[in-house]
Amino acid sequence: MQKKYYKNHVIQKKWGQIFLKDQNIIHSIISILNLKKYQNVIEIGPGLGALTKPISDIIDFLILIERDPNLVNRLLHTFTSKKVKIFNKDAMTIDFSKLLTNPNQKIRLIGNLPYNISTKLIIHLYKYINIIHDMHFMLQKEVAQRIVAQPNNKAYGRLSIFAQYYCKVQALLEVPKKSFIPIPKVESMIVQFIPYHTNNPYPTVNISLLSLLTKFAFHQRRKIIHNSLSSLLNSTEIIQCGINTESRAENLTIQQFCKLTTILHHKYNLN
């Protein structure tokens, strides 16, 4: 198979590498971020530094996480200042609490995430939600649409529920395929995640139970909720949550899923 290059770098298809090259998009992203010089900023997957350079020009200290050792070597030669620290690691293995350089400033996360790990990585990052100020990620458009989807939408599902349970999410910018090298098969979007540190609109629930409940509910999403949850809850319990038993999973709000989870929790006397 013929190797593909970008700026003399061998593009690693196994890691889903694509490189942002559109300067207009880069300027738009920097504007959206509205960075302050004192903030704790971590960039995941900096690639060859298309965003890194303008970010490092603004802030006092920047952490980069890059798994490709060849890219790390390039970055080390490009960003020689002590204000940029580079980790040659897989972001999925990182304890982000150890990267909190200023305990008075929560982390801001930025990244052009490989499409093949974006969902898993976001779920991993939610473990550190209490120390995160916000996150801005470039995602495959389909994944972005699933994250921000509302009830009564075919894109609405388990990912929508978990993303929105922890964060206010918003799609901010659509990025065309031609903005990248190599040109991907799909469009991309910038999605903003702002954690609910206070005033969470959803009640605190057992997350493992919410995961189980939504797994049953969306396993066969065309089933009515009475049938899909029959092994967990009866009709009376579903109606108690103000839910029509003829509804389908995609019709239920996150608030309603939380109510069902609470009933399930009490039903089995779980602590």
UniProtKB/Swiss-Prot annotation:
The keyword Ribonucleoprotein does not apply. Its main location: cytoplasm. S-adenosyl-L-methionine binds at residues 20, 45, 66, 90, 112. Its EC number is 2.1.1.182. One of its GO terms (cellular component) is cytosol. It catalyses: adenosine(1518)/adenosine(1519) in 16S rRNA + 4 S-adenosyl-L-methionine = N(6)-dimethyladenosine(1518)/N(6)-dimethyladenosine(1519) in 16S rRNA + 4 S-adenosyl-L-homocysteine + 4 H(+). It is an enzyme of class 2 (transferase). GO terms for molecular function: 16S rRNA (adenine(1518)-N(6)/adenine(1519)-N(6))-dimethyltransferase activity; RNA binding. Specifically dimethylates two adjacent adenosines (A1518 and A1519) in the loop of a conserved hairpin near the 3'-end of 16S rRNA in the 30S particle. May play a critical role in biogenesis of 30S subunits. This is Ribosomal RNA small subunit methyltransferase A. It comes from Blochmanniella floridana. The gene is rsmA.
